[in-house]
């Protein structure tokens, strides 16, 4: 298979595939006599794993580690599960941070009259001001 075939099958761009190769995240493809990359089912599996790992929140390094585990016949599912649960905990922390930000923004928006006056509790709060501007 050539790179355009692999791109269609995996849903990745040719540029992304080359990037993953440059970063050493996938097994290097063989080269044909004319210098074109030749891909196998193994490459499809690795690239699909990378794409899907990225979609569920794993960063590049973590995704590469998952590819390494995929290629390791001696891997332990406990390692994969541990990494997955660590990612879940990280996502949960991020959700809590986002919810806190959302609540803070809603409180600011509720404190703002949203009228034609220059007084804006949102700006005052975010700028650290504690007094209204003198008129």
From Swiss-Prot:
Keywords from the UniProt entry: Activator, Copper, Cytoplasm, DNA-binding, Metal-binding, Transcription, Transcription regulation
DNA-binding region (UniProt annotation): 4-23
Domain HTH merR-type: 1-69
GO MF annotations in UniProt: copper ion binding; DNA binding; DNA-binding transcription factor activity
One BP term from GO: positive regulation of DNA-templated transcription
SUPFAM superfamilies xref list: Putative DNA-binding domain
The keyword DNA-binding belongs to this UniProt entry's keyword annotation: yes
Subcellular location field: Cytoplasm
Pfam name, any one: MerR_1
Residues that, per the record, bind Cu(+): 112, 120
Record remark on domains: It contains a N-terminal DNA binding region and a C-terminal metal binding region.
Function: Regulates the transcription of the copA and cueO genes. It detects cytoplasmic copper stress and activates transcription in response to increasing copper concentrations.
Name of the featured protein: HTH-type transcriptional regulator CueR
Organism: Escherichia coli O157:H7
Gene: cueR
